[in-house]
Amino acid sequence: MTPGQRRRCFGLLRSAGDVWACVLEVNAWRRRHHAPPLTGYQELCRELSASGPGTFAELDTTGARSVLRRFSDAWFAAAKRRKAGDASAGFPRRRRGLVPVRWYHGTFTLDGHRVRIPTAKGTPGLWVRLARQVPYPVEQVRSITLLCEGGRLFLDVTAEVPITVYPAGEGPDPARVAGVDVGIIHPYAVAGPGGEALLVSGRAIRAEHRMHLADTKARQHAVARRAPKPGQRGSRRWRQYRARTRVVEGRHRRRVRQAQHEAARTVVGWAVGQRVGVLHVGDPRGVLDLPAGRRHNLRLRQWQIGRLLQILTDKATLAGITVHLVNERGTSSTCPTCHRRIPKPRGRTLTCLHCQFSGHRDLVAAASIATRTPGGGPTTPTSPVVLPGVVTHRRVGRHLPGAGRSRRDPRRPPGRREGPVGPRWPAPPTSGESLAHTARIHNTPPDSW
């Protein structure tokens, strides 16, 4: 991308931010005059048409309307959350410098590694070369979105992909239901209807979070003395540090996101192999409202529950599998055999003090989740819980730096030494004599010294 193309792309994003700011100013004026705000998409478009052409530089009408659609969706989403009782949900009232712009099918042109981004009437066309070719046919692409993340420009492509078609007798069976328990150490623990189970380990993701926090702390401590004071302009070295910080943050997000996609793909592939047609996923978002201390709140913030659920739902829907969110309350502290409450285990093994049942905590929870009813219902299992017998272990995040086996891991095979590893120091004499000093033994006569 040439500097001119980059400048024009950022100009489109800034113009979209101007559209967002104009909507905020109009609603602020209406609020001061005790008038209802403009929130509907149609009335916002009518207000936009009154501004006239050329108001927002090179941003065309389609791109400006996509910003209005984004504002309207954000407003109604906040209203829905407030109506449901979430007092922390806030309406969009803050200005944004760069706002993503979306263009729909028929307004842009895809030609191999190039794409023509539509601009305002009377301005030259903006052709941008892509880093790689779009992996979908042109007729399946429905929209493109220009956005900026970490100081880098991206083009998000939305395509209409058909649902997978299976041969007769090999597709997902709606009568086969599996339970999925979402966690931190194990992103997904799945219990199948026939006693099969899948355990996806995400310890590499946790290690990536810890390494990123340690690296961030070290970098901030190193440059804290050179940081500009409030009201001062940063030096060139400070700008370089900020650029490096954005690069590291973006790399960390991409690593974690790739590992999350690997975990969801592993679950969906396993479910397709087991012909599972319905996934009952435990909804753990209720724990976010519980105060759990500084350290555990950090783990919950790094968990990214919503993204894990969204990725799994998207991939399962594409494979023809239905996903239902169910209440997971008490699944990790209820015995699946005698249905009695037991102390929540601190480790990974759940043991019942009443019937002496023992099993993996996450897999037992997944087996109990499979019996729950979507949309509510009793938490006590109404049907027998199918306990997992054959467990398949999978790891995600092998591309992460901390994914290697620990040196203290007892499963680490002992190293084999093929001959000497190097020259000894000091080298032994050729005569075979020892280089150690002669020992002085006190019970020997002095003549023998």
Task: Report each predicted region and the residues it spans.
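Acidic carboxylate diad motif detector
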Residues: 40-149, 302
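Metal-dependent catalytic core segments for phosphate chemistry
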Residues: 186-240
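A short acidic-Thr-Gly-centered motif at the start of a beta-strand
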Residues: 153-176, 350
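Gly/serine-rich nucleotide phosphate-binding loop at the start of the catalytic core
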Residues: 2-63, 436
